């Protein structure tokens, strides 16, 4: 897996020697010099299957830069992107950034699809610790359940939605937000989730494969690495 740190301090030793193009997935009309350099570095390094670890002050536009370079490479190499963060505020920033990226795309480029996922206990109602089942879909007949999940999956992938929106919409449809979001992951470009999906071995082994994610064919963006 490739590792792309979300922040960067530029130094002479890190100057790019590769292409100067910043790609097509830019969230803002203009870029700061540091942002542009980070995007170019990220694209060059990820195309070489390397990793970039870096640090920079708050507000420099690190999230937008890391996403721009990662999506550019992922679209060329058919990778998925995992954006790992432990902060709810960062989940929202990623979703808003992807919305901005999509709004700036040329019409011939397909929009970026993202799934925002948090822990099951926060997405489901009354999870039974013994059986692992939730009560989200109680009273829904099987034939209706699948069609409702399909509708909800389409909603998730149609545009970037924060996990709170997914939970609320799923409750209104009497469908499990957690299960439906996980089913949408195999068709998305970016999964926003917690660190434990990669760094806690038993969680990683059970979770990633169930969602159809091949870690060896994935670009990682690690928030606050």
Report residues per predicted region:
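A substrate-engagement module of RecA-like helicase motors
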Residues: 3-25, 29-33, 77-191, 195-199
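N-terminal pre-P-loop "Q-motif" helix
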Residues: 29-46
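Hydrophobic "anchor" residues on beta-strands that sit immediately upstream
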Residues: 51, 80, 190, 219-220
């Amino acid at each position: 897996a490739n590792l792309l740190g979300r922040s960067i301090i530029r130094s002479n030793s890190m100057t790019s020697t590769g292409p100067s193009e910043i790609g097509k997935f830019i969230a803002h009309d203009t870029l700061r010099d540091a942002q542009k350099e980070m995007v170019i570095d990220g694209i060059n390094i990820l195309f070489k299957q390397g990793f970039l670890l870096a640090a920079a002050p708050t507000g420099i536009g690190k999230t937008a830069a890391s996403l721009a370079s990662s999506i550019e490479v992922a679209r060329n190499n058919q990778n998925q992107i995992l954006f790992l963060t432990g902060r709810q505020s960062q989940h929202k920033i990623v979703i808003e950034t992807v919305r901005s990226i999509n709004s700036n795309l040329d019409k011939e480029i397909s929009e970026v699809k993202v799934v925002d996922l948090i822990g099951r206990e926060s997405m489901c109602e009354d999870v039974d610790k013994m059986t692992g089942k939730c009560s989200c879909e109680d009273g829904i007949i099987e034939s209706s359940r699948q069609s409702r999940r399909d509708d909800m999956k389409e909603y998730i992938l149609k545009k970037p939605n924060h996990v709170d929106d997914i939970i609320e919409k799923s409750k209104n449809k009497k469908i499990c937000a957690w299960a439906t979001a996980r089913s949408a992951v195999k068709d998305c470009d970016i999964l926003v989730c917690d660190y434990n999906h990669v760094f806690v071995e038993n969680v990683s082994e059970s979770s990633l494969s169930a969602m159809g994610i091949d870690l060896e064919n994935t670009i990682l963006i690690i928030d606050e690495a």
